[in-house]
Amino acid sequence: MDVFEKKKVLDSFEILVDTREQDTERAHKRYASFGVPIRRAALNYGDYTYNATLPDGKQIHDISQTVIPVCAVERKMNLDELAECYTRSRKRFQNEFERARDHGCRVYLLCENASWENLLNGKYRSRFHANAFAASVTAWLVRYNANLIF
């Protein structure tokens, strides 16, 4: 690809939002801050991924089918929700990460309104002990080759 083709691909960049992600006014405000077009699509795993039109006119992902991304963002609104994923919803959470791993996808686990400091100091609403929570998160990142972003 020459520089003009690369620019055209970048100009066509859009974020795909999973159809299971809640379609709220707050979400629309968040999407507007991204500065790129947003389109809803059924993702096999994750809450967000990307799409773009290649120089041959084809899109990276055919959104008429379930999208199987190579890179995805799994968003949690806070540590409370993340703690629930490692306790009550663990099997569902694990299945999603296993599907991603089986397809060679890199998952970025985005936990909003949080920090390692808050996690380690138990500043969340759950009876999940801070040491067990930190150990679960760390093991998860290694097991599924994921990255955690606060």
Predicted features, each with a name:
Residues 1-25, 29-30, 137:
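Interdomain/boundary linker segments immediately adjacent to catalytic/signaling cores
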Residues 24-28, 37-45, 50-150:
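Extended, alpha-helix-rich binding/interface surfaces that flank or overlap catalytic cores
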Residues 33-34:
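Short Pro/Gly-enriched beta-strand edge/turn motifs at strand-loop
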